[in-house]
Amino acid sequence: DGMRLFDRLSGRQLITYTGRLRGMDAEVVNARVEDLLRVMDLQDAADKQVVDYSAGMHKKIALACAMIQAPQVLVLDEPFEAVDPVSSANIRDILNNYVEQGGTVLISSHVMAMVERMCTHVAVIAQGQLKAAGTVQDVCDGMTLEDRFVDLVGGRGEQEGLSWLHS
């Protein structure tokens, strides 16, 4: 998915490196690393090289690196792509808790059902143009977010000519 990590480090080393690179105190970093490994369910893989992680584990370790400094805003690109359902639910809980504590999460996603379930506000952007923005309820306007997205963006494919599929 194009995500670049120092994958010859272990997960623990990568999160630690990220925190120290950002000038954080070593003791604070060490405590947060252990917390992040625990909540991301990566303790068993903490000392394995990131290169050996699955795609879902890559997502979780990247999120841990993004969270180590407790930023006010997290910008995430497809955070649930290639993540198993249990990890997805855990990440959702982590992000919801982060928001409840005052953080802001900006998500870029093509999974409209997840966006509709998780987000309070949404913006639909197509070809660099803002098509709609507001609360999820206002943008959906009585439709599912996926249907509204297709309605706003257009481009639903023609289905004629596939009668041979119904043999």
Ranges and model annotations:
Residues 74-77:
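Catalytic Walker B motif of ABC-type/P-loop ATPase nucleotide-binding domains
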Residues 133-134:
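ABC ATPase "signature
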Residues 16, 20, 27-45:
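Conserved ABC ATPase "signature" region
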Residues 49-53:
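Conserved ABC ATPase signature
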Residues 88-101:
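Helical segment within the ABC ATPase nucleotide-binding domain
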Residues 115-117:
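A short, surface-exposed alpha-helical micro-motif characterized by mixed small hydrophobic
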